[in-house]
A protein has these predicted regions:
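C-terminal functional module detector
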Residues: 2-299
């Protein structure tokens, strides 16, 4: 399976499939852009068995039982629009279905008034909110997501597909940030200050998507490095989601902040960055531009 399906799409216009609050109750962002309905149906989906983090943990359980892990996936994001456009910007959203969801009225963003709107299979459904009629159905559940990040040696088809195959990839919900992640046992403490840090990390560790062979009685080091999208919000934190199997054979998960904006350290009791006052104005979606970083890196 991993040969044929090394990657899965962790986010797209029909929602983010990383995790769900019922599966990750201690993750305050587990509800990010979820589409909880079945495709083409108003019925709710069953969270269990539907999300990527749980699949990774289930794969570890299989390994613990001596069964080959079918869920050692890497991740990408993609749009899944049918328009030929990348609908990843909230302020320039082109939606998914061309003429069927081209206007704010069709997407249920503003009242439809007396307009007669068409959906995929006939007249669009309608819902009344505060005395106004809005289009319902699938378009109001769409989100402006996502993008695939690929670390290829060069911008050629052959090189990109080799990177996809080795899972040296990541997904974002739209921002064009750049993210590096390496693991190894022989990282020098001063690596982050070197101009050739990426070259040294490749030489002495494994990149995202790789497998690191465990050493007895020695913990690995992790190198994380993120650059913000210059046309989007600054970075607030770097997080690691740790998954493991406990002594009772049960899967466990922990969310750990490892780097915080402003040079502060995560709280050692909660493993969370302190609130730095960053806000989003829900009236116009503007954000605090001076409360984050253009770059975060840590080892």
């Amino acid at each position: 399976r991993i040969r044929n399906e090394p990657l899965i799409e962790i986010t797209q216009i029909k929602g983010t499939s990383e995790t769900h609050p019922l599966l990750s109750s201690r993750d305050e962002w587990a509800d990010f852009e979820l589409m909880e309905f079945r495709v083409g149906s108003p019925l709710y989906s069953q969270p269990k068995g539907s999300y990527a983090r749980e699949a990774l943990l289930n794969g570890l359980v299989f390994e613990q039982q001596g069964i080959a892990n079918p869920y050692a996936f890497g991740f990408i994001g993609s749009s899944d629009t049918h328009t030929g456009a990348s609908g990843v910007e909230e302020d320039d959203f082109v939606s998914k279905l061309g003429l069927l969801s081209a206007t704010p009225e069709q997407r249920g963003s503003v009242p439809r008034g007396s307009l007669s709107l068409m959906g995929l299979f006939g007249p669009a459904a309608n819902v009344e909110i505060d005395g106004e009629n809005y289009a319902s159905g699938a378009p109001p559940t769409f989100g402006a997501s996502g993008l695939a990040g690929v670390w290829a040696e060069e911008n050629t088809r052959d090189s990109i597909y080799k990177a996809l195959s080795r899972k040296e990839t990541f997904g974002t919900s739209g921002p064009r940030m750049r993210l590096r992640f390496f693991a190894g046992y022989d990282f020098a403490p001063d690596m982050l200050d070197r101009n050739d840090v990426v070259t040294v990390a490749y030489a002495n560790g494994v990149p995202m998507g790789g497998e690191l062979l465990a050493r007895r009685e020695q913990a690995p080091a992790f190198l994380l490095w993120a650059l913000a999208d210059t046309n989007s919000a600054p970075l607030q934190r770097l997080q690691v989601i740790k998954g493991w199997i406990d002594e009772a054979g049960q899967p466990r998960e922990e969310v750990i902040d490892v780097a915080c904006a402003g040079g502060v350290m995560p709280d050692p009791s909660s493993n969370r960055c302190p609130d730095n006052g960053a806000t989003v104005d829900l009236n116009d979606c503007s954000f605090s531009a001076q409360t984050g970083e253009a770059e975060l890196k840590v080892m």
